[in-house]
Amino acid sequence: MNYTLTKADSDNNNKKYPKQTIESVSDPLEEYLKKNIFMGKITQLLHKLVNWGRKNSLWPYNFGLSCCYVEMVSAFTSVHDVARFGSEVLRASPRQADVMVIAGTPFIKMAPVIQRLYDQMLEPKWVISMGACANSGGMYDIYSVVQGVDKFLPVDIYIPGCPPRPEAYMQALILLQKLINEERRPLSWVIGEQGVYHKKMPSERVQKRSKRINIINLSTSEKI
């Protein structure tokens, strides 16, 4: 049996069909688009506004492990003027910071302390791994050093070097600002139907691992 949907004529008060009641049927897809195009644009504008404020007001946590921390602090001097990027306000408490820079060698004894400080930071939060020791353990391939801080923390930006220069740290801030501006950062703790759960946030290395493995042609240093 074929069914035909007829739009009701509200002006005539259903005079065309006096013996039956006609229900007005609206297209749910059309209503969905009308509703969400407008609300979606407002949501996008709000997210862009929030991301703009976040990327220009980063609050790094005053936290260092070894020699790379000296290069990080050098970026806060008047020579480099990191205040141009809105991240010159070092916070003494993790509850007032949203960026953690792992500058130095992460020892196994320090890993639980770093994890606890990271958990106390504000949401959303970002992690910068600064230096070869923080990236992969560096030259300390021994039992007492964690071979990469991304073993227990989700890292967003990696800074190579031993130690990296302050300009490299400033370049990392620029990359972090682009990252914040382009994506909607999820919260680590999510409230769902089954209660509150911890969202797994993989590091940048894990996310790009398959793409890097499939690379056949390597780019020159000028194109990187």
Curated annotation (Swiss-Prot):
Per the record, what are the reactions this protein catalyses? a quinone + NADH + 5 H(+)(in) = a quinol + NAD(+) + 4 H(+)(out)
Q: Which GO molecular-function terms appear in the entry?
A: 4 iron, 4 sulfur cluster binding; iron ion binding; NADH dehydrogenase (ubiquinone) activity; NADH:ubiquinone reductase (non-electrogenic) activity; quinone binding
Q: Where in the cell is it found?
A: Cell membrane
The record's listing under InterPro entries reads:
NADH_UbQ_OxRdtase-like_20kDa, NADH_UQ_OxRdtase_20Kd_su
- GO CC aspect terms: plasma membrane; respiratory chain complex I
Cofactor: bound how, per the entry note? Binds 1 [4Fe-4S] cluster.
**EC number(s) given by UniProt:** 7.1.1.-
Q: How does it sit in the membrane?
A: Peripheral membrane protein
Q: Which cofactor does it need?
A: [4Fe-4S] cluster
Any one Gene Ontology biological process term? electron transport coupled proton transport
Per the record, the major location class is membrane
Q: Does the keyword Translocase apply?
A: yes
Give the UniProt family note.
Answer: Belongs to the complex I 20 kDa subunit family.
Oligomer and partners: NDH-1 is composed of 13 different subunits. Subunits NuoB, CD, E, F, and G constitute the peripheral sector of the complex.
Quote the function comment for this protein.
NDH-1 shuttles electrons from NADH, via FMN and iron-sulfur (Fe-S) centers, to quinones in the respiratory chain. Couples the redox reaction to proton translocation (for every two electrons transferred, four hydrogen ions are translocated across the cytoplasmic membrane), and thus conserves the redox energy in a proton gradient.
Q: What is the protein named?
A: NADH-quinone oxidoreductase subunit B
